[in-house]
Amino acid sequence: MIKLYSSDQCVWCQRLKSYLDSKNISYRELNVRSEQNAADLYRLSGQNAVPVTVIGNTVIVGFDKTAIDRELEKIQQ
């Protein structure tokens, strides 16, 4: 499962969601407005910035297409 930590006001989060949608990739969006989601984000990445994508055991901070595509390829094999 792919998890996407995001916030409503984050432009990069919107771009990342559009990118995943364009590739027909399913993901679970976790809004960091929730205290629990924010705490989980910090535990995973060591920061409070979004977007953060979790693919398998890999945590990707920011909208890094290369890293995202690499991890997506791994789980699609």
Task: Please annotate each region the language model reported.
Residues 7, 46, 65:
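ATP/adenylate-binding site constellation spanning eukaryotic-like Ser/Thr protein kinases
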Residues 11, 36, 67:
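Short alpha-helical
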Residues 14-17, 21, 42, 69, ...:
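Class I S-adenosyl-L-methionine
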Residues 25-38, 47:
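Thiol-based oxidoreductase modules, predominantly thioredoxin-like and allied folds used
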Residues 40-43, 47-53:
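Short, structured secondary-structure boundary patches
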